[in-house]
Amino acid sequence: LKIVEDAAHASGSVYKNKKIGSHGDAVCFSFHPAKNLAMPSGGLIAINGKNIKKSKKILESKRWVGISNRVGSKYNVSNIGWNYYMNEFSAVIGIEQLKKLESANLKRKYIAKRYSEELKMERKIPLRKDCSYHIFWIAVNNQKEFMKKMQENNIETGIHYLPIHKMKFYNSKVKLKIT
């Protein structure tokens, strides 16, 4: 059994007292200006194993092809995709951002704690000290009203993650009747 970690939104997070990316045979990181490791779009795959040369050849021939019809924060997954190309410009920015990752994540944790304390909701997702809080997620009953009130207070909101079975690529393959 091979383990591939998805660390796209978890730069700096910890699981079982170890940094994300140190548990499996490979780990995939995804970069974007709005993510914890803020840099131009791209990604990185780190492979821990004997067949690195074989894996490297396969991976080098791939590029990002999965997301289609993106408008703002709305998108659909219509095919399998990759996003792990890297150029020198992005790498230099990433190296500098890596130096700031811990302090930036501490600030995110502070903001998440404040949101958790200040937002009066019946259902809350528990705060975790090992989470890097790429995004602070909540569930509300009246989404439009909530988003309007947040906007009135200059707080940006968005709907970022649709359930996977509602995306084109997966909806014919997976039926999740209780979601």
Located regions from the model:
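Active-site PLP attachment segment
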Residues: 22-60
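Structured loop/turn residues at beta-strand edges in well-structured enzyme cores
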Residues: 21-22, 38, 84, 131
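Conserved PLP phosphate-binding loop immediately N-terminal to the Schiff-base lysine helix
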Residues: 1-30, 36
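Conserved phosphate-binding and hydrolysis motifs of nucleotide-dependent enzymes
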Residues: 17, 43, 179
